[in-house]
Amino acid sequence: MSAILSADDLNDFISPGVACIKPVETLPAAKPSADNELEISFNTDAPLPSDLPPAQISLTDCLACSGCVTSAEAVLVSLQSHAEVLSQLDSAPGIRLHKSATGTGVSVEGLEQGGKIYVASVSPQSRASIAATFGVTEREAGYMIEHLLSGPKGIKNRAVYRNAFQWVVDTNITREACLVLGAEEVIASMNGTEETKKPILTSSCPGWVCYAEKTHPHVLPHLSRMKSPQALMGTLIKTTLSRKLGISPERIWHVAVMPCFDKKLEASREELTDAVWEGTGTRGVRDVDSVITSKELLMLADSRRIDFSKLPRTPLPSSSHIPFPDPTLNSFLFPSNRRSSSNGSRDAGSSGGNLHYALHYFASQHKGSSVQTIKGRNADVVDYTVVADNGDILLKAARYYGFRNIQNLVRRLKPARPSRMPGGKPIGSARRPNGKATGPDYTYVEVMACPGGCTNGGGQIKVDDPINTSRLEGDSKPGPQEQKMWLAQVDEAYFSGDDSTVCSSVDDRNDLVEGISPSYIKDTLSHWATTTGLDLERLVYTTYREVVSDVGKNAGDAERVIEIANKIGGGW
């Protein structure tokens, strides 16, 4: 079923109910009474039929299922939510952290009480959504979020144990690391020293990765091995705190605020747990324990009866900040004089800028070269080339946003099916010499599931949400044009983070590319690996696997379906 959907009925959103192959549990029907097969009663005291238990699909079912193409939002909303965050905070007294006498170290209190350390990471796209909603800059939105999660007027004010998040970090920090490592991956692939097949496809979008794993396994060797900024931040937090403070990863609870519901699915991947970086091979503790969206952040405030719009738009006092236990990583995560909150240039887009940085990183290594842009068939398809000063094309790359465009890319990368006839040509080889895929000669492709990129994620605050419609005059509902204008406002808020005149602490390095120093990033990552005693590759890279579902089927049924498909030329 999924193959039919992906080829013919693909849309930018397919709810789980359309293609889910895990059927709702069928309970045995109640046996009719032998005495009264049919009964009509007007007696109001008659017993009501017993309530059936609600049907549920667990996250495990979702991860093991190949029925859905993408967008597991409806299933995951109930599993990772603002209610779960509050439940965790109110479950036990938290571990208390205090500054040491020197002001750079950390002392721990309350280990024996069974509590946890709470850490939050916030994406720039979520800050932009909040900023557009409340008419503030992206930077001010970040301060408001920090006050909500850590400040005295935030969620701790009405909490059972007055627990709050000890650190609120910006995922732009790990985004910069991902940009540098991603660019290095591209260059390594061109030199033949990278195991990922060309073209390398970005893998920071979980909706796209989920789709590839479940319906197009032939593209998995092309996926970038880099972790996403969310995943990399989770690994950095769990490894460093567990090593430095001498506590187990399960006592560090990390929530991420993201623009996308599919990020909940990413956080649940078995490849992103402590079992991977510890190498235990057992079922591990997640690097990111929970993900809430921009919408759910406001629900978090409402649940504590906090008026988000009245939260301070200034930073928390420096005296309230607990230093991260490692001074080098503390400077990396909380830079005092670096443009860490910059979301990149407008040309980089609002999805992190992987492609933009890789192009300029490559161009910086070829003196006199320039980056040229070629617009595609729509706004979400763009081709790029790096051209030498003599006119030679050094590198080709592209941007594909939205599943309709992604489907075209995937189709071009699909290898020809071998013919079953002796001596026959591969099926579809008329335009595929030697039966090879006719994929474009791209070196790198930035792929995102959402049209318009991450600021248009499914978890963002929309123009027709009550908090926005309450401001509109009349009863008219916002239409597509209003949604387009709203997305433009969110994008504008996203790039308002660039309005910083603070100088970079790495400006004295001579290798800056788009304001980021690759040598500084590499030195910091090397320090992280040394501090934790773990191999850097195990910390920053991940893996992918084809998802073949047995959910709702027994082995005999599956074998018969495959046999029939082979007989009729299904090519499964």
Swiss-Prot record:
Zinc-finger is among the record's keywords: no
Keyword Metal-binding appears in the UniProt entry:
yes
Q: What SUPFAM superfamilies does this protein's entry cite? A: Fe-only hydrogenase (SSF53920)
One GO MF term on file is:
4 iron, 4 sulfur cluster binding
Q: Which GO terms describe its biological process?
A: iron-sulfur cluster assembly
Which residues are involved in binding [4Fe-4S] cluster 1? C20, C62, C65, C68
Q: Which UniProt keywords apply?
A: 4Fe-4S, Iron, Iron-sulfur, Metal-binding
Region described as Disordered: 416-436
Binding residues for [4Fe-4S] cluster 2: C205, C260, C450, C454
Per the record, the domain of life is: Eukaryota
Q: Which InterPro entries match?
A: Cytosolic_Fe-S_CAF (IPR050340), Fe_hydrogenase (IPR009016), Fe_hydrogenase_lsu_C (IPR004108)
Q: One Pfam match, by short name?
A: Fe_hyd_lg_C
What does this chain do?
Component of the cytosolic Fe/S protein assembly machinery. Required for maturation of extramitochondrial Fe/S proteins. May play a role in the transfer of pre-assembled Fe/S clusters to target apoproteins.
The record's family statement is:
Belongs to the NARF family.
Q: What is this protein called?
A: Cytosolic Fe-S cluster assembly factor NAR1
Organism of origin is: Botryotinia fuckeliana (strain B05.10)
